[in-house]
């Protein structure tokens, strides 16, 4: 497979499930759908339509690199990226540290560079200049792709493009099975992953009969089954209705708070960021804000200048302040907002 295929195809079920981590894989989509339905836990041979070249990381153990702080899992240093054929940079010297166990939301309008940044976190793209370290491993090190993609799992926008099996539990089993995990361990991982996203009772269902939010939760379960330390979600709710969005955000928040999984959420929905530990705002390939949700959203004029909205509670208090009120713009919750307004009315 070409480097363009390996690094730039972003909405691909193999990248989602981590199988590309094993090497360069090219396949016929229809063949997958015809052959994938087999009993869970039984080894599947690679069909003849695959062209497979194992990474060197499968053949030898390599030492973990250096460069992370004690608490960070991802370190980004002076990251520049230009897409082939483009003159303008998509990322312009971005430097960030992502701490273990944190919930980080990345905001920005279309073309801000947020999705390009996401694709650098598990080596779908590699830097034109600078470096990205995942658990101390440079993403530009092709011999370590397996380690990188075992550490960082990806979930993309369209759940229909991420599901490859005809039964929910078979889909969740796809990645660990092709990583060579033992059948009993696969069974444990699948059951555990589906329970974590509240989809265990649907394990025998056909994915195409599920709602959009349920499909995306199955996609997340497929990543959880790989047992990554980090899950990156690139606008996972973009194609969902409000109910589906709420289901997905509730799921990823629980994974972070209860299981300690690091979550990086790429989104343009302000409401999805309120529960994050940290909000990063991007514009034209640069980071223009990086702080707690309260401090970022209180910069209402900055957000509006970038074509972004703020939570409804912040907008309400901002407008009231323009008319002589004195309300804190850091109260993001409805109950907090109501209490602050009640204080002013006394």
Where do the language-model regions lie?
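Helix-to-loop junction immediately C-terminal to a conserved catalytic motif
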Residues: 122
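Conserved ABC ATPase signature
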Residues: 206-210, 214
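A short, flexible loop at the N-terminus of ABC-type nucleotide-binding domains that lies
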Residues: 70-73, 81-93, 142-144, 183
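Short, small-residue-biased leader/transition segments that mark boundaries at the very start
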Residues: 1-5
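Catalytic Walker B motif of ABC-type/P-loop ATPase nucleotide-binding domains
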Residues: 231-234
